[in-house]
């Protein structure tokens, strides 16, 4: 996994191994067959158009084994946590990552995700499919944008910088859950399909969430 540092925010990008990716495709395809479980019409979530299917916690009728997803995400989160431990004075050795929630989103042109944050420690997107963009598309089309708070000395206001991620198939982005983020609409054909997830860091000897990573 590669890391980008924004003092103190850390963003990671990982290439998903092919053997794991094929299992994630299967999970995603099977989930989106359940159009009866589509949450995209719920205005309390960020999705504007398309289809969102909850994988964890899942509807009892979904019947999809997400063990490959859980194993990959928790291993990835541990690597993120190990890297975080090299940049902080906190002792993070007593923590372990636990997948708290996961869902898959499938959207077409003109559809997007509104600005939002997640209630967890770290979150991520695994890119399953990417659209073919129109030649006249904007440079932001279909991209995930993270809003990064950056302090400036003069006149000591807080400004916002951004980090943008294209929907590159077989890649996963990892970021702190408290970062506000959005996904831009686009023009073109095909779908932007992702598996999104949240992880909490808990005490290795219990399921208690110890603290929020800032």
Label for each model-derived stretch:
Residues 1-87, 91, 112:
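Non-heme Fe(II)/2-oxoglutarate
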Residues 78, 94, 107:
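OB-fold ssDNA-binding interfaces and closely related basic DNA-contact patches used
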Residues 212-214:
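Flexible, surface-exposed loop regions and adjacent strand-edge segments
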Residues 10, 191-195:
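Short beta-strand micro-motifs in enzyme catalytic cores
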Residues 87-101:
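A short coil-to-beta-strand element that immediately follows conserved catalytic motifs
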């Amino acid at each position: 996994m590669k890391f980008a540092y924004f003092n103190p925010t850390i963003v990671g990008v990982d290439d998903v191994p092919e053997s794991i990716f094929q299992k994630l495709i299967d999970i995603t395809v099977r989930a989106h067959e359940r159009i009866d479980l589509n949450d995209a019409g719920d205005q309390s979530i960020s999705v504007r158009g398309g289809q969102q299917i909850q994988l964890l916690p899942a509807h009892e009728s979904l019947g999809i084994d997400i063990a490959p997803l859980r194993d990959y995400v928790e291993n990835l989160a541990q690597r993120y946590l190990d890297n975080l431990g090299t940049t902080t004075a906190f002792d993070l050795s007593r923590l372990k990552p636990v997948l708290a929630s996961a869902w898959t989103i499938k959207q077409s042109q003109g559809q997007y995700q509104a600005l939002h944050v997640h209630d967890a420690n770290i979150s991520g997107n695994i890119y399953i499919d990417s659209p073919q963009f129109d030649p006249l598309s904007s440079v932001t089309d279909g991209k995930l944008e993270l809003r990064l708070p950056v302090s400036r000395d003069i006149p000591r206001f807080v400004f916002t910088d951004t980090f943008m991620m294209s929907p590159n198939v077989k890649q996963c982005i990892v970021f702190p859950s408290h970062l506000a983020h959005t996904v831009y609409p686009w023009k073109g054909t095909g779908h932007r399909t992702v598996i999104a997830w949240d992880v909490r860091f808990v005490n290795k000897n219990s399921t208690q969430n110890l603290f929020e990573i800032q």
